[in-house]
Amino acid sequence: MKNKNIYVIAGPNGSGKTTFAMMFLPEYAKCPNFVNADLIAQGLAPFGPRAAAIKAGKLVLQQIREYAARGIDFSFETTLSGKSYVSLLTDLKAKGYSLHLFFLWIPTPELAIARIKERVAEGGHYVPAEDVRRRFVRGISNFSALYEPLFDSWMLFDNSKAKPVLISKRRNGHREVVNEKLFAVIQESARS
C-alpha cells in the first residue's frame, strides 16, 4: 500500500508560503494537490477576495476532507496561529496519513507587513497589519506547543532572504539543528 502524505506549509502571513509551495510541491514532494484559502478566495471574488475569506476557509476544509476520503497526497498552507487544525491532523494521522511540516520563519512582523504591501502592489491579497502582528508569534508558539508532536517530519526554514535556508529539521524522532543561533531565537520567541 502506498504511503499517504500531507504536506503542511506554515508560517506567518507574508512569509512566502505560497511561493514556497509552488516551487517545492511539484518538484520535491511530487504533490500536485495544493489547497490554498487565498487562491480560493481570489477565485470566488477576484476584485475583493477578503469578502470571500470565510467561504474560502470552509471550502479549504471541504477540499481537505475530499482528498482524505480519496486517500491521495495533498498539501495546504496555514499560519498555525489557531488551534483548529489539531483535531483535523490527528484524525488524518489516524487514517494512515504521514504528516510533514515546512515552517517558513521570518524575523519580524514588520518584514511580513512590508512583503504583504509589495504583494498587494502586484495584485495580491491584503492582510491587515494588526492581524499579521497578532498571528505572528502565535504561529511559532502553536507549532512548538501543539503541532510539532503531530508531525512525522518537519523542517524549519529562515525565509527572510531570496531562498529558504534550513534552520532545523526532525525526522524519525531525530532532531538536527543546522543554525543553533537562529534556532535559539525562535525557541525564545515561541515561549513569549
Named regions from a protein language model:
Residues 2-6, 70-72:
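Pre-Walker A (Motif I) flank of P-loop NTPase domains
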Residues 55-106, 139, 155:
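Glycine-rich phosphate-binding loop used to anchor ATP phosphates in small-molecule kinases
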